[in-house]
Structures are given as C-alpha cells and as structure tokens.
A protein has these predicted regions:
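Substrate-binding pocket helix/loop in short-chain dehydrogenase/reductase
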Residues: 99-118, 216
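Short C-terminal tail/terminal secondary-structure segment
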Residues: 2, 158, 235-236, 247-260
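Short, small/polar-rich loop/turn modules that mediate ligand/substrate recognition or access, typified
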Residues: 89, 185-190, 246-248
Length: 260
C-alpha cells in the first residue's frame, strides 16, 4: 500500500514540540521528508533524528519566525536541501508574551502592555504570514502546486477572557489562510487552517489543574483533552490527496466544542 505523502517534502515550523513535533513524525511515517524548524535548536535536531530513523530525509533549522531574514533563509535552505517544498505546516506559536518563561498569566486587554501584544502577534500572525508567503513564492516557482496549512485555534471564533492577544492572532491566521486560498488557487496551491481545541502540549501544561482549564475540558463533549496526534492527523489529511479539494477551510479537532 502506498504511503499518503510518499516522496513529498514538508517544512514544519514549531516542528520540535507539541503539535509540530507530532506532525513531523506523522508526516515522516507517511513518506515525507521533513525540515524541522524551531527556535530550540537542540529540540529540532532531536526531532529530525527521529524522522531519519523512520527512513526519511530530515534537516533541522533554528529559526525565529518573526524575523523575515531568518524565515527566508529557512525556506531557501529547505527547498535546496530537500529538493523543493510541497507542504508547509506553520505550527510555531505562543499563548502569551511570556510563554516559555514561567507561568502564563491572563491579562485583560486594557491591562496588556503594547509590547506584549506585539510579541504575541509577531510570532502567531506575522510569523505565519512570513512563513507561508515565502513558501508560496517557492511553490509558484516550482510549478507543481502545494499545500499550505496553519495552526489557528478554536479561539479564532470564540473569545477567551484574558487572552485577547492570542484570540486576535489566531483569528488573523484563519483569515490569512482564506485570503491565500483565494489568491493561490490558480497555482494549484491550497491553504487551510486547523483550529484545535484543548490539546496536551507544552503550551497547555501550565494551565492544567487551573479551574479555567478544567471548565474548558468540561465544555468538551468528548470530556477529554486532545492529543497532539489528533491535530497531526488533521494536518496529514489536508496535506494528502484526500484533502486536495479543501481550500480556505478551518477544521476543528476539538472533541466537539465548536458544534455548540
């Protein structure tokens, strides 16, 4: 039986942890070569090594997705070393300005310093724009179409009190994918977003045990936290032939939250 991504080349930002790491490995299991791009160099190297163990070509690149020069260098290197880019998954993101630096605290918008707002938007929205447009230019040059996928959130549609910066950034990602789908369809390039629910990743570790987190689980009809693999399988569908007629959509692996 043929693999669903056999011979394809994928670039995954945020590819060394959480949803990005699960997607790097899932894509490799289905035959893709993978460029694992992440701000944590050692974690990117470790994930790339796991991709190699699965029999695929892998490269690891350290990148700050909010830096235009670094993003362009990442795309150029991935295209050169992999032999082109067929799929991009923009999974790099933060839940708050101090993500990774201690416990994430909710802040109402009127108490949110502008520099913290900008940090979240620069990674979650600017970073997706820079990554996906740079890859789109490469795909157009290659002339063989492609798949653009970005991680948004259920918070793109339903606001979370105290997380306005995150919600706005993820709503922007969804609209960005719709606009790219409209503009890139003539090149046989699809663009879609994924809006996960509550997923067990490093981003949610600080929240677990918090009453607000427990309420989020209780609002999930399936009454469980999602796994990174739940989202990786959604990305795999959009990257594969089965997802070839989806464009401008947002899919919600969320245990049923968005139907309410």
């Amino acid at each position: 039986m043929s693999l669903r991504l056999d011979g394809k080349n994928a670039l995954i930002t945020g590819g060394a942890s959480g949803i990005g790491r699960a997607s790097s490995l899932r894509f490799a299991q289905e035959g893709a070569n993978v460029c694992v791009a992440d701000r944590q160099a050692s974690a990117a190297e470790e994930t790339a090594a796991q991709v190699t163990k699965l029999g695929r070509k892998a490269i690891a690149i350290q990148v700050d997705v909010s830096n235009p020069a670094q993003v362009q260098t990442m795309v150029d290197r991935a295209a050169k070393e992999l032999g082109g880019i067929d799929i991009v998954l923009a999974a790099a993101g933060v839940s708050a300005a101090n993500y990774g630096e201690g416990k994430v605290e909710s802040k109402f918008l009127n108490d949110l310093p502008f520099e913290e707002w900008r940090k979240v938007l620069s990674i979650n929205l600017d970073g997706v724009f820079l990554t996906c447009t740079a890859v789109a230019r490469e795909m157009i040059k290659q002339g063989r179409g492609g798949r653009i996928i970005a991680i948004s959130s259920g918070a793109a549609k339903v606001p979370l009190k105290g997380s306005g910066d995150y919600c706005v950034s993820k709503a922007g990602v969804w609209m960005l994918m719709k606009c790219m789908a409209l503009e890139l369809g003539r090149y046989n390039i699809t663009a879609n977003a994924i809006g996960p629910g509550v997923i067990d990743t490093p981003m949610t570790k600080d929240m677990q045990g918090d009453p607000r987190f427990e309420r989020m689980i209780n609002r999930t009809p399936l009454k469980r936290i999602g796994k990174p693999e739940d989202v990786a399988n959604t990305a795999l569908f959009l990257a594969s032939e089965e997802g070839s007629f989806f464009s401008g959509s947002i899919l919600h692996p969320d245990g049923g939250v968005m139907m309410q």
